[in-house]
Swiss-Prot record:
Belongs to the ATPase epsilon chain family. Pfam families: ATP-synt_DE_N. F-type ATPases have 2 components, CF(1) - the catalytic core - and CF(0) - the membrane proton channel. CF(1) has five subunits: alpha(3), beta(3), gamma(1), delta(1), epsilon(1). CF(0) has three main subunits: a, b and c. Keywords: ATP synthesis, Cell inner membrane, Cell membrane, CF(1), Hydrogen ion transport, Ion transport, Membrane, Transport. This is ATP synthase epsilon chain. One of its GO terms (molecular function) is ATP binding. One of its GO terms (cellular component) is proton-transporting ATP synthase complex. It is found in: Cell inner membrane. PANTHER family: ATP SYNTHASE DELTA/EPSILON CHAIN (PTHR13822), ATP SYNTHASE EPSILON CHAIN, CHLOROPLASTIC (PTHR13822:SF10). It comes from the Bacteria. Its main location: membrane. Produces ATP from ADP in the presence of a proton gradient across the membrane. Signal peptide: none annotated. It comes from Helicobacter hepaticus (strain ATCC 51449 / 3B1).
Length: 131
């Protein structure tokens, strides 16, 4: 099976660059999934969480405030204004990343329902990221 190359960058640098099995992206018209072989697409991105699975089967989450995605059959390139990877080697590092993500998301959206939904999703999955 072919894989995707996922690149997530901000004006401050690279957040993630690697091979993945799939990506779920918060598009401006709703979330959508990308698998290898996807058609070419450009999409605006809204406040939300990018979810992906790397080749080892580990799930990754990256909170973004807004941006855009360029998708081809083998690549997903995301440029976000702001992004926080929910990752770390210890629970305290992950809790700090979640706190940073909450701050980013809160500043990006006045929609309290959307904010609550995204934060709830991040918090419910955080234990999956402790290595």
């Amino acid at each position: 099976m072919e894989n995707l190359t996922l690149s997530i960058v901000t004006p401050y640098g690279s957040i993630y660059n690697g091979e993945v099995k799939y990506v779920v992206i918060p598009g401006s018209e709703g979330e959508f999934g990308v698998f290898p072989g996807h058609c070419n697409l450009l999409s605006l991105l809204k406040v939300g969480v990018i979810e992906f699975e790397n080749l080892e089967g580990n799930k990754g989450l990256v909170a973004i405030n807004w941006g855009h995605a360029q998708i081809s059959d083998t690549d997903v390139n995301i440029i976000a204004d702001g992004a926080v990877a929910i990752a770390g080697n210890t629970e305290s590092e992950i809790v700090a990343a979640i706190s940073d993500a909450k701050t980013l998301l809160k500043e990006a959206s006045d929609d309290s329902a959307l904010f609550g939904m995204v934060v709830s999703r991040v918090e419910s999955d955080y234990k999956n990221f402790i290595k």
